[in-house]
A protein has these predicted regions:
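A short, proline-enriched helix->beta-strand linker immediately N-terminal to the Walker B motif
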Residues: 157-161, 190
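Alpha-helical transmembrane segments
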Residues: 267, 280-310, 314-318
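Conserved ABC ATPase signature
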Residues: 138-148
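Conserved catalytic loops of ABC-family nucleotide-binding domains
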Residues: 83, 186-195
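Short coil-to-helix segment of the ABC ATPase nucleotide-binding domain corresponding to the Q-loop/switch region
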Residues: 98-106
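Helix-to-loop junction immediately C-terminal to a conserved catalytic motif
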Residues: 52
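Catalytic Walker B motif of ABC-type/P-loop ATPase nucleotide-binding domains
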Residues: 163-166
């Protein structure tokens, strides 16, 4: 399903080259819970970003469903992220003025899904994470664990094959962290979950595979995938997805914008008022400038009319002058 072949990632800082990943080769099963452990700066998040199509590898190859990504264009990466990947981060990234249901629906607005289907799939995803009775709440009315559940529901609503989690329990207390890990473990029964974490205890307890990185290299893999072993894939049959070009309708974009304006009436009014003052000020300055120019022109015309300028022509008789000089 997902295979990394000798992946290398380099960053250039001035004249120096920093090696984030050095020849990483990993094969993943179609459904498993993989935890990536390592010290800060060892390349964990870089690895996750490359798998998710958020960053490009320098060398090597990322193979998705048996297809190389070396020739992938931006549109191909967009389709891959939109249909095959779900992201869960340490920060929930929820829109505060939208309800829980609307936040989850938002993930489907780029997939060309009808409004009724979006609503139904969002409800099902929230029920799956245990928030079926919290649909109308806003994010600021929920606990950290509940908001992370909303983020997980948003990642699942598009039915991705792979769920990428970057420190999903980093901002949660120990009890809530356990709840989130239990949820991820349940999801991993039919999806590939790759989680970056600094918590080895949670990783060892809930993951069925742990990969350790050091200085951009894989130094340990507790349960490597042997491609010679044929695993049952009956639960994946019939899941072929029809790739659609990601897009958001103008009506949806307008609706989101108006909703944002209406939920922040005070700021919208103050912004409009300040903008109006600016526009009125510019119009006033232009009017004064135009009036002053007209007044100056009027004064000039009146002054010239009172003191007319006369032009006379004088001629000199050069013949008589020459005659007198020759005498």
């Amino acid at each position: 399903m997902l295979q990394l072949k000798n992946i290398t990632k380099d960053y250039k800082i001035g004249n120096e080259k920093v090696h984030a990943l050095r020849g990483v080769s990993i094969d993943f099963r179609e459904s498993e819970f993989v935890s990536v452990l390592g010290q800060s700066g060892c390349g964990k998040t870089t690895l996750l970003n490359i798998i998710g199509g958020l960053d490009r590898y320098t060398d090597g190859d990322l193979i998705i469903g048996g297809k190389s990504t070396k020739e992938f264009k931006s549109a191909d990466w967009d389709t891959y992220r939109n249909h095959s990947i779900g992201f869960v981060f340490q920060s929930y990234n929820l829109i505060p003025h939208q309800t829980v249901l609307s936040n989850v629906e938002l993930a489907l607005t780029l997939s060309g899904v009808s409004k009724s289907e979006r609503r139904q799939r969002a409800k099902e995803a929230l029920v799956k994470v245990g928030l079926g009775d919290q649909l109308k709440k806003k994010p600021n009315q929920m606990s950290g664990g509940q908001m992370q559940r909303v983020a997980i529901a948003r990642a699942l609503v598009n039915d991705p094959d792979i769920l990428l989690a970057d420190e999903p329990t980093g901002a949660l207390d120990s009890e809530t962290s356990v709840q989130i890990m239990e949820l991820l473990k349940e999801i991993s029964k039919d999806k590939l979950i790759i989680m970056v974490t600094h918590n080895p205890e949670l990783a060892e307890k809930y993951s069925n595979r742990i990969i350790r990185l050091l200085d951009g290299k894989v130094v340990d893999d507790t349960n490597p995938y042997d491609r010679n072993i044929v695993e049952p894939i009956e639960n994946k049959k019939g899941k072929e997805k029809k790739a659609k070009k990601p897009s958001m309708s103008y009506l949806t974009a307008l609706s989101l914008s108006l909703n944002n304006l209406m939920t922040k009436k005070g700021r919208t009014f103050m912004t409009s008022f300040a903008g109006s003052i600016g526009i009125i000020g510019i119009a006033l300055i232009l009017s004064i400038s135009s009036g002053a120019q007209l007044y100056i022109k009027s004064v000039e015309e009146e002054t010239l009319a009172s003191y007319p300028i006369s032009i006379s022509r004088n001629s000199m008789d050069m013949t008589s002058m020459m005659t007198s000089m020759m005498k």
